[in-house]
Amino acid sequence: MAIQHRDPRGGGGSRDARTNRRIKAREVRVIGAEGEQLGVLPIDQALARAQELGMDLVEVSPMAKPPVCKIMDYGRFKYLEKKKQNEAKKKQVVVQLKEVKLRPRTEEHDYDTKIKKVRAFLGEANKARITVMFRGREMSHRELGQKVLQRVIEDLRDVAVIESAPRMEGRQMFMILAPNPKMLQSQRDKAKAAAAAAPAAAPAAGAPAPAPAPAAPAPAPTAADPAAQR
């Protein structure tokens, strides 16, 4: 393999590091494949070192004097970096904001149903916007909306904390609740405990069942045994 024919970037964008023949410096400080310092070398000699190992010469610090280059398998390096980024994205938690609308005089059954939904939503590590809608003359009784929101706070105290205190916006009074950190930690602890206590995995579908243990042989009859005498 000749190094001049390898370009792991495949003509990629400017974000990628310069590699191999794309490195413009006449001499570079070289770091070996195992992290060892190889000193300052002419670019041709540095490329030859990388070629001997079947690897790439990658410019990792272009602004240094002279630029710093590392011998590595650049294609594999980029693959692992992409894999790490994908795994990090999978671990990111997307927090949603769910709005629940109430009235100053919401019926009890409707209130209970909506509170259950908010409780479940907070339990999934999401946030909730609780909005009290005013109509007509209800605007002159804003204290009723405050009472409704205060009741919500009390009913969800074990699973929620106030992120945004109640305030008016037009004909609406609203607040934003976030999951209670203690509740989320308790859920994580329970999940870990359940995973630790889980029984051993069952045999895969279609796998043969384990053979039954052989039965113990019957004891040999003795001289005193009537069956032996017969």
UniProtKB/Swiss-Prot annotation:
Residues 193-208, 221-230 have a biased composition (Low complexity). Keywords: Cytoplasm, Initiation factor, Protein biosynthesis. Residues 1-21, 184-230 are annotated as: Disordered. One of its GO terms (cellular component) is cytosol. It holds the Pfam family IF3_C. It comes from the Bacteria. The keyword Cytoplasm applies. SUPFAM superfamilies: Translation initiation factor IF3, C-terminal domain (SSF55200), Translation initiation factor IF3, N-terminal domain (SSF54364). One of its GO terms (molecular function) is ribosome binding. Residues 209-220 have a biased composition (Pro residues). Gene3D superfamilies: Translation initiation factor 3 (IF-3), C-terminal domain, Translation initiation factor 3 (IF-3), N-terminal domain. The keyword Magnesium does not apply. It is found in: Cytoplasm. One of its GO terms (biological process) is ribosome disassembly. InterPro entries: T_IF-3_C_sf, T_IF-3_N_sf, Translation_initiation_fac_3, Translation_initiation_fac_3_C, Translation_initiation_fac_3_N. Monomer. IF-3 binds to the 30S ribosomal subunit and shifts the equilibrium between 70S ribosomes and their 50S and 30S subunits in favor of the free subunits, thus enhancing the availability of 30S subunits on which protein synthesis initiation begins. Belongs to the IF-3 family. This is Translation initiation factor IF-3. It comes from Anaeromyxobacter dehalogenans (strain 2CP-1 / ATCC BAA-258). The gene is infC.
